[in-house]
């Protein structure tokens, strides 16, 4: 799906990977670009707008842990531009010391935003179809002992995205669901592995993990922008050490209705 002339929302667009992806997306000649974030960085918003005057950039102060904030922000988008064509769910934290906050931001907030946004995009309701990109992690595909709670949240994102991205739903709504899984990237989130691990026993292996080869946020952001345009329902992509690769998950069981 080309993004030219489209209306795009990026939840968590002022983080490191998110902001790099935002800069890439500004080259796509979108009609409007809505950045939702708890962070308030007016200079970053101005810098985005300066990249392409053809795209109108909006900033919304956003609390992903609040259903009311989610509902109000999405309603505001529809009131301004009528249609939502792409929704990118990129808010996330890594702090295994606070399990509730980890789940509320990484998983529950993403689920609530998707469930609130998808009906607004549904071609059988008030939308015209589109794409939802949920940002999970390579730690949503494989376990990582130093960050067990974070892993659980990202495994949840993967399970939710694969379920709601079933062809049954896509054929009805016209809304594709794609999952993007960054590997270790040079951001403050990566640094948290070394200080906010699951158990005291985790310290040694978390420090070793911190020494793993990483990638630049600019590279990961470019991959994310590419995935947004793919519009491949059910697609799962890994961005790791500078390479973007499609993932085919192992299927152990399928519902009988298929």
Curated annotation (Swiss-Prot):
Alphabetical list of InterPro entries matching this protein: ADH_Ceratitis-type (IPR002426), NAD(P)-bd_dom_sf (IPR036291), Sc_DH/Rdtase_CS (IPR020904), SDR_fam (IPR002347)
Pfam families: adh_short
Any one cellular-component term (Gene Ontology): cytoplasm
Catalyzed chemical reaction(s): a primary alcohol + NAD(+) = an aldehyde + NADH + H(+); a secondary alcohol + NAD(+) = a ketone + NADH + H(+)
UniProt KW keywords: NAD, Oxidoreductase
Enzyme class (EC, first level): oxidoreductase
Active site: 150
CDD domains according to UniProt: ADH_SDR_c_like (cd05323)
GO molecular function annotations of the record: alcohol dehydrogenase (NAD+) activity
NAD found in the keyword field: yes
E.C. numbers: 1.1.1.1
Residues given in the record as NAD(+) binding sites: 9-33
Oligomer status and interactors: Homodimer.
Protein name: Alcohol dehydrogenase 2
Organism of origin: Ceratitis rosa (Natal fruit fly)
Taxonomy of the source species: Eukaryota, Metazoa, Ecdysozoa, Arthropoda, Hexapoda
Gene, per the UniProt record: ADH2
